[in-house]
């Protein structure tokens, strides 16, 4: 096995803690947001918002999606229809606001909503079942959500991963993506922080 690139969505240790070991063991290149260069260990390649990053046969559009952290980015492999989103968006949820503001996170989620809805979403953590309980509490009549929860439970029962998810499913079921304005998003985020 050879790991050539380490794609860093943000500087939190659970996402960048292995960078130096990957560089040492595989001579991997560390890619991250230029504004976070002092917080991402071993960074080699600096990327910025709306840049197309190329590596051999792969191309990814970089999206700056602040909210969880100020320097959070996403890698959109648009030809393959895959989005590596880190901790900005989770299946049926979104990341906590640590450095950013509710408005920044709301705007970042709106940016994601403009990506083609047949895109696969790869997030940084698996909180799907817990997130589903919160969504159901606040959107109890949503049949799409109820069906997604049944699918999640079936997958977990059979030892299958619930990820990736598709953006089209998240648009129908994820209450954070359905929030109409910053105020309603902020209320949901505050409720989720204490759920």
Which sequence ranges carry the predicted segments?
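Short hydrophobic/aromatic-enriched beta-strand-loop microsegments
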Residues: 27-34, 84-86, 142-147
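Residue-level signal for inorganic ion chemistry
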Residues: 10, 22, 87, 125, ...
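Generic secondary-structure boundary/loop-capping signal
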Residues: 19, 37, 44, 50, ...
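Catalytic core of the metallo-beta-lactamase
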Residues: 4, 40-136, 193
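Glycine-rich, phosphate-binding/catalytic loops in enzymes
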Residues: 23-25, 101-102, 139-140
């Amino acid at each position: 096995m050879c790991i050539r690139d380490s794609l860093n969505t943000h500087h939190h240790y659970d996402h960048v803690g292995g960078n130096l070991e990957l560089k040492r063991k595989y001579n991997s290149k560390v890619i991250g947001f230029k504004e976070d260069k002092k917080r991402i260990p071993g960074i080699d390649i600096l990327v910025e918002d709306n840049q197309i990053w190329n590596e051999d046969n792969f191309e990814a559009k970089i999206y700056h999606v602040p909210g969880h952290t100020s320097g959070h980015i996403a890698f959109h492999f648009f030809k393959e229809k895959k989005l590596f989103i880190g901790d900005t968006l989770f299946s049926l949820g979104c990341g906590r606001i640590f450095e950013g503001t509710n408005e920044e996170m709301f705007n970042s989620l709106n940016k994601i909503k403009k990506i083609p809805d047949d895109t696969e979403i790869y997030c940084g953590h698996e909180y799907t079942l817990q997130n589903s309980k919160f969504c159901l509490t606040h959107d109890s009549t949503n049949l799409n959500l109820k069906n997604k929860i049944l699918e999640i439970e079936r997958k977990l029962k059979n030892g299958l991963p619930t990820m990736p998810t598709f953006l089209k499913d998240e648009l129908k079921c994820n209450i954070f993506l359905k929030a109409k304005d910053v105020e309603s998003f902020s209320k949901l985020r505050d409720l989720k922080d204490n759920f």
